[in-house]
Structure formats: C-alpha cells, structure tokens
Amino acid sequence: MHQQKRQPELVEGNLPVFVFPTELIFYADDQSTHKQVLTLYNPYEFALKFKVLCTTPNKYVVIDAAGAVKPQCCVDIVIRHRDVRSCHYGVIDKFRLQVSEQSQRKALGRKEVIATLLPSAKEQQKEEEEKRIKEHLTESVFFEQSCQPENRAVSSGPSLLTVFLGVVCIAALMLPTLGDMESLVPLYLHLSVNQKLVAAYILGLITMAILRT
C-alpha cells in the first residue's frame, strides 16, 4: 500500500517571514504618506495564514489585518494612520506579522515592522543633510589632525633659500682674495677682505638659524 509522503513538522516561531518594507514613515504634512502598503511574501510550497498585530491599534487602521497567502505568492496589507497629531511625532510604534499554516493555529514565524510619524519630509531631509555635514566636518578635522605632525616635520628643516645662501657664502670664502696673483681664478672673481668678512658673517647667521630648527 502506497504511503502518502508527509511534510516535515515545522518548529514554532522559527519560520522566516519576508515583509517589505521593514519600516514605515508617515509625514504629517504629506497626506499621501498617511496610507502605506506592507507586502507579505510567501516563498514556500504551502499556504500561510497571517495576522497583523500592533502596539497602538487606536492610531492605525489595518485593512485585511488577517488573511491567507497562497504558495509562492504575495499579498498587500494597507495600513492607514488615523491619528496624525504633533504629540505623536517621533514615537516609534510596532506592527507584528504572525504567520501559521492554514491547518494549524500555532505561529510558525513572526516579523516586526516599526512605524514613525514625523512632522515633515523636508524637515527630515534637512536633518539628514545636517547629519551628513557634521560627519563631513568630523572627517575633515580628523584628516587635518592626522596630517599636522607631518607638516610640522617637513617645515622644521632649513628652507631652500637658507641652504642656497649658505652655499654661496662658502663659495665666496673659498675664492681668492684681491692681490693674490698666483691664483688661476679669473681676476673678476677675486673678492676683497671686506666682502669675505660679510660672507663669513652671513654664514655664521645661517649656521645659527639651522642649529635652532
């Protein structure tokens, strides 16, 4: 006798539930957002029953709060905010979707969706923009602090002008003095004693400046 193949028993509460979106945001100044849609997907090979629960049911109207989803199908659940008041701004409410097999009452899985009422979409965008600017400024400050020691290390050495003047003064001291007839250096490169004294003085100043850096 052929025995019918039985479906393995599912463990209560462990079945993944697929819902989109997972967050609902209602804007007080935009009536088009006061009614939103949750889509419940059933990727399984058996039908599912579902039920929608809410932490604050007096604030919302849920159309088709209970029903069934055929195998590998989806169903839309319409949620409407009916208590749009400033005292509810920023309050986080929760919806819970529970699913079970049609032939059983125990919940096989559940998924929570949060809902928030905000005063304005523009205000929300402004807050997000301010947050991005603060993050950018924080990153900029961090970047400057990271580079600052390196910049100080680079600027701590002698400048190119200082090095150039030092080389010129050394070269001037090595040139022959006026009246030195045995030198092979052209006469126009011969320096007077006073000129060499000036070069030596400047070289001394440069040396002191380099030692202080």
From Swiss-Prot:
Motif (Nuclear export signal): 205-208
Keywords in alphabetical order: Endoplasmic reticulum, Golgi apparatus, Membrane, Transmembrane, Transmembrane helix
Cited SUPFAM superfamilies: PapD-like
BP GO annotations: negative regulation of transcription by RNA polymerase II; positive regulation of transcription by RNA polymerase II
Function comment: Plays a role in differentiation and/or proliferation of mesenchymal stem cells. Proposed to be involved in epithelial-to-mesenchymal transition (EMT). However, another study suggests that it is not required for EMT or stem cell self-renewal and acts during later stages of differentiation.
Domain of life: Eukaryota
Entry-linked Gene3D superfamilies: Immunoglobulins
Domain MSP: 16-143
UniProt name for this protein: Motile sperm domain-containing protein 1
Entries under InterPro entries matching the protein: Ig-like_fold (IPR013783), MOSPD1/3 (IPR039283), MSP_dom (IPR000535), PapD-like_sf (IPR008962)
First-listed, main subcellular location of the protein, grouped into a coarse class: endoplasmic reticulum
Transmembrane segments: 159-179, 191-211
UniProt source species: Rattus norvegicus
Pfam family, one: Motile_Sperm
Gene this protein is translated from: Mospd1
Membrane topology: Multi-pass membrane protein
Compartments, as annotated in UniProt: Endoplasmic reticulum membrane; Golgi apparatus membrane
Keyword presence, Membrane: yes
GO cellular component: cytoplasm; endoplasmic reticulum membrane; Golgi membrane; nucleus; perinuclear region of cytoplasm
UniProt KW Transmembrane keyword: yes
